[in-house]
Amino acid sequence: MAVQKSRVTPSRRGQRRSHDALTAKQLSTDPTSGEIHLRHHITADGYYRGKKVIATKSSAVQED
């Protein structure tokens, strides 16, 4: 088992943990549908930045 050579001070421990904080997910609202989605991801309807990018099952059923 690994054993440390010297004790880690509280400040050194805090410096190591300074990058462990969690951040909230960045959400965007689609301009055409108004749907909330993750940044740089398409919506469930297949829209990205206001344009239809991919045909989805729900849109294929509505077109028929």
Curated annotation (Swiss-Prot):
GO terms for biological process: translation. The keyword Magnesium does not apply. Residues 1-35 are annotated as: Disordered. The keyword Ribosomal protein applies. Pfam families: Ribosomal_L32p. Keywords: Ribonucleoprotein, Ribosomal protein. Belongs to the bacterial ribosomal protein bL32 family. HAMAP family: Ribosomal_bL32. This is Large ribosomal subunit protein bL32. It comes from Xanthomonas euvesicatoria pv. vesicatoria (strain 85-10).
